[in-house]
Amino acid sequence: VRKFAGTEIAQNLIHEILFYCEVDFKFFTQAVEALGDSIPDCGMKAMIFDAYDKLKAKQLTGQAPDFELPNVKGQKIRLADFRGKHVLLDFWASWCAPCRKKNKELNLQYPELRDAGLEVISVSLDSKKTLWLQALKEDRVEWIQLIDETGFEQSKVREAYKVEQVPTVYLIGPDGNILLKNPEIEEIHEIVKQERA
């Protein structure tokens, strides 16, 4: 996109990958910035910027909304209890195949993340506790697991975090502010390392 900034070619490239852009807002932002201000006015330009503005309005920024949900033992856990630490907040569900895959990937990264001082908290949007517990048993996850049994559609926590699909992950700073949405593992390590330096 940068190579063809200011041309209709760049617009066509973004149009072709618009679906991916809507999944990854950070990438969408970089692509729109790469277009520059010198894009010829046309219907496609308007469509791209309209899609960008709508997606931008859905982004969560500032303080992470606090919540309290039960863990596997039924104990209520509050997000605010982890203030002072980096938190990787993961929204998922047992019926979500990409979420289950992410669990397996995170299993490999978790020891290193934990040793770096980062807490991982997963919030299941399952409406049936038994399915959630079975998935945890199968995936053998070791980090903090919470459930919102109201389910995906009714979850107030999901709404507060503007989660439209799972998996959705937020990196939250020690001050409780949202740092990144759907970060890559490398980005997480880099931010934690920078802030601890």
Language model segments and positions:
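Oxidative protein folding and maturation machinery
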Residues: 1-77
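Conserved redox-active cysteine motifs that mediate thiol-disulfide chemistry
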Residues: 83-84, 91-108
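Loop/turn elements at helix/coil->beta-strand transitions in domains of secreted/extracellular proteins
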Residues: 84-86, 116-118, 140-143, 174
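Alpha/beta-hydrolase fold active-site loops
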Residues: 86-87, 167
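Conserved hydrophobic packing residues within short motifs/helices of P-loop NTPase cores
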Residues: 89, 121-123, 146, 170
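Structural microenvironment flanking redox-active thiols in thiol-disulfide oxidoreductases
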Residues: 101-139, 150-159
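Thiol/disulfide oxidoreductase modules built on the thioredoxin-like
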Residues: 141, 150-193
